[in-house]
Regions:
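Conserved, charged/glycine-enriched, solvent-exposed linker/hinge segments
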Residues: 1-21, 25
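Covalent nucleotidyltransferase
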Residues: 16-136, 277-278
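A short catalytic or substrate-binding loop motif that flags glycine-/basic-rich loops and adjacent residues
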Residues: 17-20, 27-31, 158, 190-192, ...
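Flexible glycine-rich surface loops and low-complexity tracts that mediate binding to linear polymers
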Residues: 28, 71-82, 168, 200, ...
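Short aromatic-glycine-enriched beta-strand elements
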Residues: 44, 206-219
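Intrinsically disordered, low-complexity regulatory tails
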Residues: 89-103, 107-108, 115, 226-228, ...
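Amphipathic alpha-helical
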Residues: 140-195, 203
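Short, acidic/hydrophobic/Gly-rich beta-strand patch recurrent on exposed beta strands
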Residues: 217-222, 228-230
Length: 278
């Protein structure tokens, strides 16, 4: 069914990103049920799906939203519980006759406001709502300013999210009924998986380029081209890998990535695991 009233992200495009001003606004990409919450003049919340249907299956969450005391404002987010599958979420949210026994566990993760202000101002307005301090089950999605994507992509993938949302700091809210896919919003979800030979390791450095006696990244190769990939290891494991003799030639790195670059190396590589050569 066609969606309406919400802003939809374009697939990641490096050329488009290169035209955007820095810093970018980054958020984890969550895989829930998209929904707006519309507060009227009396402060009564209405949860509306991205297809324009009112959701009445979540009385506990609706009460929490009413407790926010908001009026004449529209929140944009997803009905979501971290660690639940999309099917589990749909089973709870999609009830139309009876209430699911786990409806009280459902949360609303808020990532934007719907109004006429630029993205950076919308984020500031959302911050001052102090949602995390006023209501149970209403959770602001974290956001960071960044000049590059790799570190945050790796962090949020490791935390169990499906990728990154990248926001143009000056972008206006463009509902999909006005613009099919927003010019100011992109999603990055690495989908390709491959194994690559490890040919070396690089030492971790401080921001002042001082060595830290720990593994910083593996050096890998593909078709004669070298590239590096972080590991996501704990500090203790990074120190252990650096101090101990690690025979790189005996292992491959399994890597999740967006696509191969023109020179044949993975774009936005994310380390998954070590694979012993047979």
């Amino acid at each position: 069914m066609r969606r309406t009233g919400v802003m939809l992200a374009r697939p990641f495009d490096a050329k488009r990103l290169a035209k955007w001003p820095k810093p970018y606004i980054l958020q984890p990409k969550i895989n829930g049920r998209r929904a707006r919450v519309i507060f009227g003049t009396l402060g009564n919340p209405m949860i509306m799906s991205s297809e324009g249907h009112i959701i009445n299956s979540l009385p506990t969450l609706t009460a929490s939203l009413k407790g926010l005391g908001l009026k004449e404002i529209i929140l944009d987010g997803e009905l979501y519980v971290h660690g639940w599958t999309k099917q589990e979420i749909d089973r709870v949210v999609g009830r139309s006759v009876t209430i699911h026994k786990r409806e009280a566990e459902m949360q609303y993760h808020v990532f934007d406001l719907i109004n006429g202000f630029p993205q950076s101002q919308r984020r500031e307005m959302l911050y001052w709502l102090r949602l995390e301090q006023t209501s149970t089950g209403v959770i602001p999605v974290p956001s960071v300013d960044a000049d590059s994507l790799e570190e945050d992509l790796e962090h949020w993938l490791a935390a169990g999210y499906e990728g990154l949302i990248i926001r143009h700091k000056d972008g206006l809210y463009q509902p999909c009924n006005e613009k099919a896919r927003s010019d100011y919003l992109m999603k990055l979800k690495p989908r390709k998986l491959g194994v690559f030979p490890i040919i070396g390791k690089l030492e971790e450095e401080s921001i002042y380029k001082e060595p830290k006696d720990a593994l910083g990244a593996f050096l890998c190769s593909h078709e004669g081209q070298r590239f590096k990939v972080g590991t996501g290891f704990t500090r203790a494991d990074r120190e252990r890998f650096w101090e101990n003799e690690f025979k790189c030639r005996n292992y491959l790195a399994e890597i999740l990535y967006q696509e191969l670059s023109e020179r044949g190396v993975p774009i936005f590589p994310v380390f998954k695991r070590l694979v012993a050569k047979e």
